[in-house]
């Protein structure tokens, strides 16, 4: 007869650490960042402690205080991608468990494993065992990344697991859309919203990486990185690394200066000067000439119509025109962007853009008479 082992008799040191299932967010080891050239900068410069997390100091200080007082509740961190949610939880794990934190956390990506079976098996098995590897009974941590992608049945099952194993386990739920998480789970967690990073904090962190990698980036290039990332630090670091690799001259020991144009060309976004030129044509040239010129610059620089529409919409706010005309332009451009999202013909939609501006021009001229 097989001898059964109680969950309390299991030593976590004897359990093989689980391989985290995530979206490329590999857990960085305790200590200084790895120095391998092949390491993505997103992982190489991931914050190792709560003090290293950029921005959100009020949230970080609150979590730090709860950790110091041994009063850490279940957490629900939500907000746009690249704002430091996962990095914050991993920093908390390092602070709580030190070098043995891998044995004390279960990291799952709910986009990959989001069914009810994961909650009933993997999560419940991990939560039901108690660890004495740190010399005393200590709570463990379950990190559910992209929890908003879990099915409703899995979320209801998770609610019961959280209630049952609160004494031995803390749960940290991470998601982009809090409205996709059932109210029963939200009420069992302390919620923190991570807003997009502002330009000041992003610039400071990017300058740190630029200095560490010994890059040369112009002020305009840095501003372009901040603008294109829209508060997403992960996106900013990926763009910086891609631009560095694309602009690096193999014949020289040092990379050339990264400019605004390098950043825009690497990402495929239209340059601000190109948008100004296109807007000038739309507001001044006849239909046939404007169509020819915009088509030519679109083909020559490999621009996408949807990117042109987005940038022109932002540019409209900088132009002095009657409010009624501005409202009509934005409404028409929104319809064009909607049609483009369904794969409508680019040439037809380019004609629609020019027609929209031609009609707006006629209204402005008529009002001036």
Curated annotation (Swiss-Prot):
Keywords: ATP-binding, DNA replication, DNA-binding, Nucleotide-binding, Nucleus, Plant defense. Pfam families: AAA (PF00004), Rep_fac_C (PF08542). One of its GO terms (cellular component) is nucleus. It is found in: Nucleus. Residues 21-40 are annotated as: Disordered. One of its GO terms (biological process) is DNA replication. Disruption phenotype: Moderately dwarfed plants with small organs due to reduced cell proliferation rate. Enhanced resistance to pathogens. Heterotetramer of subunits RFC2, RFC3, RFC4 and RFC5 that can form a complex with RFC1. Functions in cell replication and proliferation. May be involved in chromatin assembly and remodeling. Plays a role in the negative control of pathogenesis-related gene expression and systemic acquired resistance (SAR). This is Replication factor C subunit 5. It comes from Arabidopsis thaliana. The gene is RFC5.
């Amino acid at each position: 007869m097989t001898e059964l082992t109680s969950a309390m008799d299991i030593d976590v040191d004897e359990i093989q650490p689980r391989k985290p299932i995530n979206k490329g967010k590999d857990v960085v080891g305790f200590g200084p960042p790895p120095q391998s050239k092949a390491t993505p900068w997103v992982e190489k410069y991931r914050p190792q402690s709560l003090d290293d997390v950029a921005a959100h100091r009020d949230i970080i200080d609150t979590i730090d205080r709860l950790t110091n007082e041994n009063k850490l509740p279940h957490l629900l961190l939500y907000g746009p991608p690249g704002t430091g949610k996962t990095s914050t939880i991993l920093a908390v794990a390092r602070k709580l468990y030190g070098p043995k934190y891998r044995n004390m956390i279960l990291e799952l990506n709910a986009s990959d494993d989001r069914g009810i079976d994961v909650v009933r098996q993997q999560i419940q098995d991990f939560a039901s065992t108690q660890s004495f590897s740190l010399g005393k009974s200590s709570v463990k941590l379950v990190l559910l990344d992209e929890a908003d992608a879990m099915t409703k049945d899995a979320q209801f099952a998770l609610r019961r697991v959280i209630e049952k194993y609160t004494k031995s386990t803390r749960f940290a739920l991470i998601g982009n859309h809090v409205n996709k998480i059932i109210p029963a789970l939200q009420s069992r967690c302390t919620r923190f919203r991570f807003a997009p990073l502002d330009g000041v904090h992003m610039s400071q962190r990017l300058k740190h990486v630029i200095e560490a990698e010994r890059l040369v980036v112009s002020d305009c290039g840095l501003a372009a990185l901040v603008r294109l990332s829209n508060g997403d630090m992960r996106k900013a670091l990926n763009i910086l690394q891609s631009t560095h690799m694309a602009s690096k001259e193999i014949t020289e020991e040092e990379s050339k200066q990264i400019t605004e144009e390098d950043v825009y060309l690497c990402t495929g976004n239209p340059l601000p000067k190109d948008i100004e030129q296109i807007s000038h044509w739309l507001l001044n040239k006849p239909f046939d000439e404007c169509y020819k010129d915009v088509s030519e610059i679109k083909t020559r620089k490999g621009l996408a119509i949807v990117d042109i529409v987005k940038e022109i919409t932002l540019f409209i706010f900088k132009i002095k025109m009657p409010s009624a005309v501005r409202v009509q332009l934005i409404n028409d451009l929104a319809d064009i962007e909607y049609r483009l999202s369904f794969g409508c013909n680019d040439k037809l939609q380019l004609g629609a853009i020019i027609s929209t501006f031609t009609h707006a021009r006629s209204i402005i001229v008529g009002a001036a008479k």
